[in-house]
Structure formats: structure tokens, C-alpha cells
């Protein structure tokens, strides 16, 4: 049986037996290991190295009505991404976001995965060849049309998209590359 549980509640649900396993972003896999109630069967990096991950999404109406705010939002994400991608800043970021008002997870659990230090909970420890990346000289946050088109093809493949669409046109309308370029240019972020 599949159930939907918010990521921060997954460890607690495992602990009380409401679920036997889960697929989730960090730090919740590491938290289950740290708490001694789970292990990591595989990481998403094992399945698809450097895969697209989270999305900052806004409606077209928001972008049209508040273009400066939308641009500033992108700039804030780019600045934060550049900061976090610097390994020397990751410990302070882990400390900041570990607080109960943010992620509410132990700082050490967050920090180790930030640094690419993995422990699967059943005896294997390693330094990940593809640790979390947030900026990588502007490549990570760029809204690649190829990613958008790939996701659309998968929606079609798995029956979530019922009719044929112009994948490129849809990806262009969603990805807002021009707005991204404006924001990136103001910060001297390279455009891939």
C-alpha cells in the first residue's frame, strides 16, 4: 500500500510502524539511519547522477503581475545557491537550517550529506562522487528546456498527459529562460 506522508513526518511514521520504507530527499534518509530505524537502499544519485531535483515554481499570472519580484526571487535563489555550493559554507548552512523553524533535523545529519559523506546504515560508508550541488558555475539552477521536455515525455509515457502537445513550446512557456537570464546577468552568473 502506498501512502502520502510529508517528508518531515516520515521518520516518525517509520518509528511507530505506520510505514515500512520511503523515498524522500535529504536529510530524511540520513535521519532514519541516525535514529537507528532505517537504511538507505540506494540514492537517487546512484540511479541518475546530477538529476534535476527541486523546482521553484510561480504562476504565469504572478510573473506577469510582479516581474521585478519574480526576477528578485530568482536572484535570491542564485545567490543562495552560489553561497551553499562553496564547501566552506556548508557547515554554517547546515547549522542554520537544522533549526526547528526550518528543517528541524540534527545539524550533523544535514552536514554529512551536504559534504557528500554517506553511510547507508548497514555497514557501507563512502564519499559520494556526485555530492549535492546547488550552483556549479550557474549550471544547476538553469531552466533547461531539455529537462522540461523530458518530464513532459514521461508524463505522456505514464499516462499522466492524455493528449499530444508541442513539448518544446510547453517547456519554453514554463521555463521562463529570458527571465532567468535577466536575473543571472545581473549577478554575473554564467549562462550555460
What residue ranges belong to the model's regions?
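C-terminal functional modules
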Residues: 177-192
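Short helix-initiation/N-cap motifs at beta->coil->alpha
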Residues: 1-16, 27
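Secondary-structure end/capping motifs
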Residues: 65-179
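A ligand-binding cleft/hinge motif common to bilobed small-molecule-binding domains
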Residues: 19-38
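Short, contiguous, pocket-lining structural segments
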Residues: 2-6, 20-24, 65-72
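Ligand-binding cleft/hinge of the Venus flytrap
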Residues: 1-2, 34, 156
Amino acid at each position: 500500500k502506498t501512502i502520502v506522508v510529508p517528508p518531515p513526518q516520515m521518520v516518525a511514521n517509520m518509528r511507530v510502524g505506520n510505514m515500512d520504507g520511503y523515498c524522500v530527499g535529504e536529510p530524511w534518509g540520513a535521519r532514519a539511519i541516525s535514529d537507528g530505524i532505517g537504511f538507505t537502499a540506494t540514492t537517487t544519485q546512484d540511479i541518475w547522477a546530477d538529476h534535476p531535483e527541486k523546482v521553484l515554481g510561480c504562476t504565469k499570472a504572478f510573473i506577469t503581475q510582479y516581474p521585478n519580484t519574480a526576477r528578485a526571487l530568482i536572484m535570491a535563489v542564485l545567490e543562495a545557491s552560489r553561497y551553499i555550493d562553496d564547501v566552506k559554507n556548508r557547515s554554517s548552512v547546515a547549522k542554520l537550517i537544522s533549526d526547528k523553524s526550518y528543517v528541524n533535523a540534527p545539524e550533523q545529519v544535514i552536514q554529512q550529506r551536504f559534504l557528500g559523506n554517506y553511510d547507508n546504515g548497514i555497514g557501507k560508508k563512502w564519499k559520494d562522487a556526485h555530492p549535492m550541488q546547488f550552483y556549479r558555475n550557474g549550471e544547476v539552477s538553469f531552466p533547461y528546456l531539455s529537462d522540461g521536455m523530458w518530464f513532459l515525455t514521461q508524463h505522456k509515457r505514464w499516462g499522466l498527459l492524455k493528449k499530444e502537445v508541442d513539448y518544446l513550446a510547453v517547456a519554453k512557456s514554463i521555463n521562463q529562460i529570458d527571465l532567468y537570464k535577466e536575473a543571472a546577468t545581473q549577478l554575473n552568473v554564467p549562462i550555460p
